[in-house]
Amino acid sequence: MEEKYNPSAVEEKWQGYWAEHESFKATEDPTRKKYYLLEMFPYPSGKIHMGHVRNYSIGDVIARFKRMQGYNVLHPMGWDAFGMPAENAAIQHKSHPAKWTYENIAYMRGQLKTLGLSYDWDRELATCDLDYYKWEQRIFLEMYKKGLAYKKSSAVNWCPKCETVLANEQVEDGCCWRCDSPVRQKELEQWSFRITNYAQELLDDTYKLTGWPERVLTMQRNWIGRSTGCEIDFPLENGLGKIKVFTTRQDTLFGATFMSLAAEHPMALDLAGDAQRAQVEAFIDKVKKTDRIKRGAEDLEKEGVFTGSYCVNPVTNTKMPIYLANFVLMDYGTGAVMAVPTHDQRDFEFAKKYNLPLKVVIQPEGETLDPAAMTEAYTAEGIMANSGRFDGMGNGDAKEAIADFLEKEGIGKKTVNFRLRDWGISRQRYWGNPIPVINCDLCGVVAVPEADLPVVLPMDAEFTGEGGNPLARVDSFTTCTCPQCGEAARRETDTMDTFVQSSWYFLRYCSPKFSAGPLDREKVEAWMPVDQYIGGIEHAVLHLLYARFFTKVLRDLGYCNVDEPFSNLLTQGMVIKDGAKMSKSKGNVVDPNALIERYGADTARLFSLFAAPPEKDLDWSDQGVDGSYRFLNRVWRLVYDVLPVIGEAGAVNPDSLGAEAKKLRRAVHKTIKKVSEDVEERFHFNTAIAAVMELVNAIQAFAAKDAPENVAVVREAVESVVRLLAPFVPHFAEELWSQLGHDTVLEAAGWPGYDAAAVVDEEVTVVIQVNGKLRSKLTVAPDAKEEEVRAQALADDKIKPYLEGKDVKKVVYVPGKLVSIVVA
């Protein structure tokens, strides 16, 4: 064994061994319990960063731990490879997106391999591979046939810099999630997936996801946003139609004094009178330039315009002016709001600004509100007033009674509404999966016949940076023949949102080379669901919701029998340096390559796992990295020093051990127990590593003598340290295991179990309190009888002075911990 630890030599040796022996290749085996471990796959941006190192190290610990426990582990890796950065790079470097992407993949794959991550590289996939995206096109066509994919004209979020559509979930504080540019509203024909068909199931099944963080589940439930209420028809005053409203507050219907419509409402221009048309058109144009997020904000200044038209409150028969309002969205309900200014704050602010009438219909119990004196809306519970037959009822009871009344009178109906909107997937970019449809002037939208799939991205697109979709400028791609009528037609040039590819990759990993369809159902059933998924919380209502939706769709299409894709979810924190997330713009990036070159991959892994619990942000510390490296050197030196002594040591005989040897053995087995629980039950890798560090201190402090039983204890202790470190620092641990004389790898050795008898303390310390104050301590056997402990406590020399001349009222014993004496 070399005297000094040489990380590069050790890591090169064991990475070569794992590759040669295909150590992490997963095959279906019904005789073994499966464990599917997955981290969210990366975008091949060029280089991995410390966030990747941390994320993938967390996953690798779990994968290696489960292998040592005997599980059949699937741990794959791939690339979320379509997307806009590749096009931008093509423009900047005058290189094709495919070339840039595949070069990045090759480089990043090499980086991941240097970290010693236990991936089954045989299952590697890239979403830009034809063998991947062709099956996605087939899935799209099956969804189209089922009515789950459709095209329609609608107002969309448009990023002028990226020149593409964004889903609602991709707009953050009014800006594009990628480039941070302000988002505008634009009317476009676009393809969407009918995720709303699954809204109720997506909501219901969140309550089955007991292995997910409650924060993520709450975010999804709020995004889906189920509301129970009524749809109510408000006739137009001219008798030429009606406005349909969805409300959850039918108890306030008698107080509705005006109507607010979204600027995008289909009736908005039709309702404009001649005198108001110019104002209405100007207002609509202004609102369409404001993003949805700002329009929904509570602090938005309320603005509107009178259309010149009126509708009629169906229960009071009073005339209600119809306004367009900037805070009303087409995304929710019907895009029309019955305005009740006395009981809704936004309506109140709007009514005050435009001098609209106020009518109180819910009074606080025992009080009377005066509309003229109100300074804000009354939104609490109360007693119905000015509401006809419902006066005097509590407004909660009135909700149900009014809903029944509306249905009986044919004015409205009870209904459920969701905040969730259908998922717009059209993107005006080249580097994405082509949508497999043809646009024909005679036949309309025509699906590409399955026999003609895949629709392949042309390689001769030009990337000029002049804007627009490069795909639309490739005549050889766009010009085609209609498969129905045989006339000239034009191929769809929109490509699919990259979140489509990441919505099913975890299923494809189960059979990545399957050539008869998207999924091999038998293999999917062998591996799914993913037992542990790891990724950032920023994906809570994007990728994680879409993946759940897609899994349910593929189930209903007959490809799998899985309801939910991910049984357990761990959302890891960020890597922070100098008080901010690492980024090039902030100049606080740490290059993993430089770190590995100096210290080795195992040190990089150890620091990223030891510095903080996985779910918390990790504060970068150069001293912490040095400390991790010193610890590994200390363990290496420990093995080097004791190896000549313990080489021939036999098994431990617990009955022949002296007090110090027993103490060390107890520390060993307590550490095994703690590390096992910290890794398996809590993912508290930091405390697990800290426990191993303490054990190393205990071994070094133990003076090994020539007595055979002492040598055996030291060998057991050292081997336990190596086995416990194996998931965290795998190259290092394998090398030490080999040097200790083992001809099998650590996975074959298995995870160590602890001796239950060895972890029991021979003595425990019991504190003695008198009237709640600590006065002394006792050392007793763990199984000492209560009477004995009480007697010792009362006879303790330090306790006697507090009992003299006092009456002992009560003595309480908490086994192994406390004797509480109460005196008066």
Curated annotation (Swiss-Prot):
GO terms for cellular component: cytosol. A motif ('KMSKS' region) lies at residues 581-585. It catalyses: tRNA(Leu) + L-leucine + ATP = L-leucyl-tRNA(Leu) + AMP + diphosphate. It is found in: Cytoplasm. GO terms for biological process: leucyl-tRNA aminoacylation. Pfam families: Anticodon_1, tRNA-synt_1, tRNA-synt_1_2, tRNA-synt_1g. It comes from the Bacteria. Keywords: Aminoacyl-tRNA synthetase, ATP-binding, Cytoplasm, Ligase, Nucleotide-binding, Protein biosynthesis. One of its GO terms (molecular function) is leucine-tRNA ligase activity. Its EC number is 6.1.1.4. ATP binds at residue 584. A motif ('HIGH' region) lies at residues 42-52. It is an enzyme of class 6 (ligase). Belongs to the class-I aminoacyl-tRNA synthetase family. NCBIfam families: leuS_bact (TIGR00396). This is Leucine--tRNA ligase.
